[in-house]
Amino acid sequence: MIVVAGAFPVDGSKATEITDAANTMRVATLQEDGCHEYRFSFATDDPNTVLVFEEWRDQEALTKHFVAPHMAEFQAKVGTFVTGAPTISRYEVTDKGPLR
């Protein structure tokens, strides 16, 4: 499994626009083969930071996501509210289970 997690700086005054774009992207992405989770949220300590968390079956599914039509649409919208470079990492996970 591939996990993607990170953050990007945004103009927090555009929270409604950001939320609408993120929700549209989430709905479309969850329909992709191999997408297990796809979430955006505002950081609780900084209204100018959006956090992203994704779970993918494998690298192939994630690679296909990058060329999906809704990804291009989302990237065009992101330019209207992102204020800097994102910090996003990819992790290969070999095991997943409940926290003990």
Annotate each predicted stretch with a short phrase.
Residues 13, 45-47, 69, 73:
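Short alpha-helical
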Residues 2-40:
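N-terminal first-folded block
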Residues 2, 40-48, 76-100:
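Glycine-rich beta-strand-turn "strand-cap" elements at beta-sheet edges
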Residues 16, 53-54, 91-94:
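Intrinsic disorder/low-complexity signal
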Residues 2-9, 39-66:
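Short, well-ordered beta-strand segments in beta-rich or mixed alpha/beta enzyme
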Residues 24-36, 55-89:
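An amphipathic, aromatic/His-enriched active-site/gating alpha helix that lines ligand/cofactor pockets
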Residues 16-18, 48-50, 62, 98-100:
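Short acidic, gly/pro-rich beta-turn/loop elements at beta-sheet edges
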